[in-house]
């Protein structure tokens, strides 16, 4: 029978077991990435720099993507949706109050961890953490920069010869992003846009077959058909359509792609919702509180045990 010689050996034994367990988890994740052809390394670009003026009740203190739904920023919810399908490498294009986003993620690991502060030995020990296995790059792309120019300014961070996801920091959906990626690869065009069917205050598209033949930023009237859902996949060469000055993603580059037959619609009939007003925010909050949030990926995301994080608290830390 094995006999402990001292507490030191006991501690070393548990340290070895912990190391072996972490190595196993790392190897398992690497194996899954290989099975998926390395696709989990794809970049997810999130536009998070606008002023959010229609939601000024919240955005006078924090940027719109940091407005909380169920105690967490909507930005976090969006990232959870991508992460559920194995896409964990994020580039956040900040602007207005970008420091709030940086502070949130700077403190995120601490706030989601069980931790021991040993003041006597001047040590901090993280016992366990509920933080996601994400890589998050935050770039201040300018206060007044337009959407297309924000993407242009982070082009050096994108992987060569690989498509990238792009979305806005204010909308959630129940889309299967791996299905969207497979769809994008199947048609061989420059870009894929999610096409959804809510109210007509968003950009509309004319679709023939699967190809988008016309892109209209904000149509008039109720009969506007499917609209731009704001969840895109682009091939890397798309950045050539962009400039660093006064380039709106929606009114110029997307329309050019449509005219060239390089923009394809991925039609989605599931849940989709954009948070533009306080009423929208309250609706999402209500869905969350009732436990009926369609975008919640509960089988992988441990939402129930996620501690509430107030981004304003991070500014004081």
What are the language-model segments listed below?
Residues 162-165, 172-173, 177-185, 197-200, ...:
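Catalytic-core segments of class I nucleotidyltransferases/pyrophosphorylases
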Residues 44-46, 92, 166, 191-194, ...:
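Structural beta-sheet core signal
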Residues 100-209:
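Conserved beta-loop-beta/alpha segment of the NTase-like Rossmann-fold superfamily
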Residues 7-9, 13, 31:
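Intrinsic-disorder-associated, low-complexity terminal segments enriched in Asp/Asn/His/Tyr and depleted
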Residues 16, 21-41:
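Short, Lys/Arg-enriched N-terminal segments with co-localized hydrophobic residues
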Residues 38-103, 107, 138:
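N-terminal glycine-rich phosphate-binding loop and ensuing alpha1 helix
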